[in-house]
């Protein structure tokens, strides 16, 4: 059995975890909960915290460089911010259409 973890494998695992967090938000995209529900926000915050700890652990083990760890975190944060922005804009558009009708 191989006792080491390849860098490529570790990064893939972390990217898979990041994708799961993004899917959590995408699956709620059609719901008002994403923009108005504190419980959902706390779930996302908890997931992000857990992910950041995984990245820190991989960095401390020397599997990732600091730059790679920062990139993984900033990429996920940027994508999550975009998802939140998209949901906010869609909600605003629906509200405007509702006011016109």
UniProtKB/Swiss-Prot annotation:
Pfam family, one: DUF1507
Organism domain of life: Bacteria
TM spans (from-to): none
Entry-linked Gene3D superfamilies: SO2669-like
Disulfide bond entries: none
Similarity remark: Belongs to the UPF0358 family.
Protein name listed in UniProt: UPF0358 protein EF_2458
Source species of the chain: Enterococcus faecalis (strain ATCC 700802 / V583)
């Amino acid at each position: 059995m191989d006792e080491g973890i390849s860098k490529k494998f570790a990064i893939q695992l972390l990217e898979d975890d990041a994708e799961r967090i993004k899917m959590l938000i995408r699956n709620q995209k059609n719901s008002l909960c994403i923009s108005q529900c504190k419980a959902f926000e706390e779930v996302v915050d908890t997931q992000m915290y857990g992910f950041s700890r995984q990245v820190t652990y991989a960095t401390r083990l020397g599997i990732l460089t600091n730059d790679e760890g920062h990139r993984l975190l900033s990429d996920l944060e940027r994508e999550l911010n975009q998802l939140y922005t998209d949901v906010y804009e869609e909600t605003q558009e629906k509200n405007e259409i509702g006011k016109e009708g």
